[in-house]
Amino acid sequence: MPGNLIDLEGHDLAVVPLGHTDTDNTTCLHVPSIGLVVAGDAVYNGVHLWLPESNPQKRREWITALDRIESLHPRAVIAGHKRPENDDSPKTIEETRQYIRDFDRLASATTTPRELYDKMLELHPDRLSRGALWSSARAAKS
């Protein structure tokens, strides 16, 4: 594989390093010819984000990773964590970014894990995996 490109049936698949998202050293796969990004753990679609491995600086790095994905101008984004009935719209990039911003804002404005958890549920009541949110709230307030 020369560089970060893979040829698959005449399509270039580019491995794009993203840095920290829900863990360190995340990558995504970009298929420019069809406007596709397989975002892996960088983008969530209708699911609470896994934030226990991040502090405010790491969450800023995640937002930078989302900016990088957005700069690829995808028409479809395959999220690594997804509510099955949701489509693969690129709007999930901004939804993931906004979730991180909401979490950071509320982490600063709350005092207990339960308060942070409850406030996030008020903003994001329909997301799956409330256990991930609880783990994130506990980590942010420990």
Which positions does each model-derived feature cover?
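Accessory terminal helices/loops
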Residues: 4, 9-12, 71-76, 83-142
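Second-shell loop/turn segments in exported
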Residues: 50-53, 104-106
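Metallo-beta-lactamase
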Residues: 1-25, 33, 66, 70
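Active-site metal-binding loops of divalent metal-dependent hydrolases
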Residues: 20, 41-42, 80-83
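Acidic, metal/cofactor-coordinating or nucleic-acid-engaging core segments within structured domains
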Residues: 29
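Residue-level marker for buried hydrophobic side chains located in beta-strands
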Residues: 36-38, 78
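A short, flexible beta-alpha/helix-coil linker loop
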Residues: 43-50, 84-85
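An active-site-proximal "capping" alpha-helix that borders the catalytic cofactor pocket
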Residues: 53-80
